[in-house]
């Protein structure tokens, strides 16, 4: 059991305001298993998404790395519904289409590359002369009134991460991967040691608890893009857990895998800005990881791991969000929005 999973179990056993519903997890496992059977081997393939790279080479590795160091906090301050055709939330227009959330990040990077800006090159974005702050800001120019959240933090992280790759790993994520010898947990240790902004760790009831959303999703997206081969081969890939963000916990609650206290529900329904490392936030993230582990145990298939389930749930959440769909498991409940925490970790 990985450190993240051990800490998630500890949180779930001691949680006050978030609980894992084992019956709900078992029911959802049955439902997901049926979905996977009907979708077949093509389900949730990383390369099927229109904005993901279609080639499997070193340039794609650096694309993945840049996306994952910036993959955090895309929920909107101006649009509570967080979706809709007339949303004012941060958006990137690319090839005649508006993209929001994680997809706005992918669109911005692809748009810059199309314009001849080598934005995925660590040597480029580490260099303030070649790549000034104003250029990075222009890459993330919004098509709406809302600007990209935490722009200054994103620029800082790009500079710091790029310098580490240039100074220690031959200027590429590829150099970092070669040091991990096909071991996901070794890659994570290197990320935590050399890249401080991957250190997604909270203290809960006196215990240091690892969440590691972005470090783990970097492993997962590398694995998914390269389909477990070459740069994407990790012999311990099943040690990776669900990625504790703000979107998947929301759908886990909708599906009846999680239950929230009345106090936590009230805070979410008020769209309260909750501080990072608030106990309720830690409980939500830890219990989400443990809930997906329970789902995984109930599915009990060698070809399904926590990454598979997380990708499936995230895609489903975005689909339901776009359609305004509400599952029958919470039919008597108002829709609870995603947690509003401004953090560089998710």
Curated annotation (Swiss-Prot):
Effect of gene knockout? Lacks queuosine in tRNA(Asp). Supplying exogenous queuosine (Q) or queuine (q) results in q incorporation in tRNA(Asp) in the wild-type S.pombe strain, whereas the deletion mutant strain fails to utilize exogenous Q to modify its tRNA while retaining the ability to use q.
* UniProt binding sites for queuine: 49, 243, 245, 310, 315
Q: What is its EC number?
A: 3.2.2.-
GO molecular function, a single term: queuosine nucleosidase activity
Q: Which reaction does it catalyse?
A: queuosine 5'-phosphate + H2O = queuine + D-ribose 5-phosphate
Give the CC-aspect GO terms: cytosol
* GO BP of this protein: nucleoside salvage; tRNA-guanine transglycosylation
Name the job this protein performs: Catalyzes the hydrolysis of queuosine 5'-phosphate, releasing the nucleobase queuine (q). Is required for salvage of queuine from exogenous queuosine (Q) that is imported and then converted to queuosine 5'-phosphate intracellularly.
Task: Report the PANTHER family cross-referenced here.
Answer: QUEUOSINE 5'-PHOSPHATE N-GLYCOSYLASE_HYDROLASE, QUEUOSINE 5'-PHOSPHATE N-GLYCOSYLASE_HYDROLASE-RELATED
Domain of life (superkingdom): Eukaryota
First-tier enzyme category under EC: hydrolase
Instruction: Extract the InterPro entries matched here.
Output: Q_salvage (IPR019438)
Query: Which family would the database say this protein is a member of?
Result: Belongs to the QNG1 protein family.
Record's protein name? Queuosine 5'-phosphate N-glycosylase/hydrolase
- Annotated catalytic residues: 245
The record's keywords, sorted A to Z, are:
Hydrolase
An additional note in the Swiss-Prot or TrEMBL entry is: Eukaryotes lack the canonical genes for de novo biosynthesis of queuosine (Q), present in most bacteria. Therefore, this molecule must be sourced from ingested food and/or the gut microbiota, and metabolized to its corresponding nucleobase, queuine (q), before incorporation into cytoplasmic and mitochondrial tRNAs. Incorporation of q into the anticodon of some tRNAs contributes to translational efficiency and accuracy.
């Amino acid at each position: 059991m990985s450190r993240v999973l051990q800490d998630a179990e500890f949180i779930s056993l001691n949680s006050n305001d978030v609980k894992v519903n084992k019956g709900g997890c078992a029911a959802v496992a049955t439902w997901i298993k049926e979905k996977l059977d009907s979708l077949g081997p093509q389900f949730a393939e990383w390369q099927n998404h229109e904005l993901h790279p279609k080639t499997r080479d070193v340039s794609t590795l650096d694309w993945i790395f840049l996306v994952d160091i910036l993959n955090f906090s895309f929920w909107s301050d101006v649009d509570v519904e967080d979706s809709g055709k007339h949303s004012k939330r941060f958006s990137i227009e690319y090839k005649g289409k508006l993209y929001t959330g994680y997809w706005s990040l992918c669109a911005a990077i692809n748009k810059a590359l199309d314009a001849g800006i080598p934005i995925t090159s660590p040597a480029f974005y580490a260099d303030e002369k070649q790549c000034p702050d104003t250029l990075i800001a222009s890459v993330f120019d919004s098509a709406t009134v809302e600007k990209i959240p935490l722009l200054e933090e994103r620029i800082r992280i790009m500079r710091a991460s790029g310098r580490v790759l240039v100074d220690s790993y031959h200027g590429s994520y590829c150099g970092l991967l070669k040091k991990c010898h096909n071991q996901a947990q070794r890659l994570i240790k290197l990320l935590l040691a050399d890249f401080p902004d991957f250190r997604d760790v909270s203290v809960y009831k006196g215990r240091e608890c690892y969440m590691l959303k972005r470090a783990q999703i970097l492993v997962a997206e590398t694995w998914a893009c390269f389909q477990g081969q070459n740069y994407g081969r990790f012999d311990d890939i099943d040690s990776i857990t669900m990625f504790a963000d703000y979107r998947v916990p929301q759908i886990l609650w909708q599906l009846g895998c999680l239950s929230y206290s009345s106090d936590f529900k009230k805070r979410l329904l008020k769209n309260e800005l909750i501080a990072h490392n608030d106990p309720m936030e830690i409980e939500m993230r830890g219990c989400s990881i443990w809930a997906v582990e329970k789902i995984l145990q109930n599915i009990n298939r060698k070809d399904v791991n926590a990454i598979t389930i997380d990708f499936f749930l995230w895609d489903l959440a975005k689909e339901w969000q776009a359609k305004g769909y509400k599952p029958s498991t919470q039919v008597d409940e108002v829709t609870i929005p995603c947690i509003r925490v401004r953090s560089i970790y998710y």
